[in-house]
From Swiss-Prot:
It comes from Cupriavidus pinatubonensis (strain JMP 134 / LMG 1197). Its EC number is 2.5.1.145. The keyword DNA damage does not apply. Catalyzes the transfer of the diacylglyceryl group from phosphatidylglycerol to the sulfhydryl group of the N-terminal cysteine of a prolipoprotein, the first step in the formation of mature lipoproteins. This is Phosphatidylglycerol--prolipoprotein diacylglyceryl transferase.
Amino acid sequence: MLIHPQFDPVAIHIGPLAIRWYGLMYLAGFIMFLWFGRLRIRQPHMAARGWAARDLDDMLFFGVMGVILGGRLGYVLFYKPSYYLTHPLEIFKVWEGGMAFHGGFLGVLVAMWLFARLRQRHWLEVTDFIAPMIPCGLAAGRIGNFINGELWGRPTDLPWGMIFPQAGDNIPRHPSQLYQFAGEGVALFIILWLFARKPRPMGAVSGVFLIGYGGFRFAAEFAREPDSFLGLLAMHLSMGQWLSLPMILIGIAMVVWAYRRQARSGEERPVTDSGA
């Protein structure tokens, strides 16, 4: 049995300014996005499509806005709509916590659509480009969850079960944050990076991301404690699982569509449409 280390959520104090670990994890995710994005630009099939370093800076700006706005609205709409309906001003108190990945994901999709319009590229061409880097941010975020001792797992008698003092029950639980770090972070990054190293039909990389994230998240939810204010929903599945199922189905459909489209076109190289 292990006990959570109880890290100080504040990493650095600079005068009256308190820099929290969770904020540093966001920063780490953005830095990794830029780092691996520059490596991706150097891949021959990406360079041939005209991707440049300045695109990364703009994509990061749009992406950050999408994550923050979408993540917050997703939490409000998916998890606590009735509460925020009666306390609308609480929606703006982002510093008090309350972000949802699925909402942030939708926010990023909208942001990348706007970026695609600005750059006169196809939306799926943009999402295919960024998909391999997204797990970097997911991995950093899960480490932030673990440092904060939040989003702990369900009770377990496994040797690596961990007591999270914030849970208030002194029961060993799955360190589900680390499961998600390993699955939707590390493993998904490796899968996508290797898959995207070669030219693929437009939409295929995005589809593999949806399948991979949805699958890893769906599996991890069996070890993660459901939100106390929601519990388990229909068929004893959590909200995270119900939101992940459409991602898996849409991802499968996208991969099938992408390869069928390529086969119909008779092209040996992937299709790269222009225009939004």
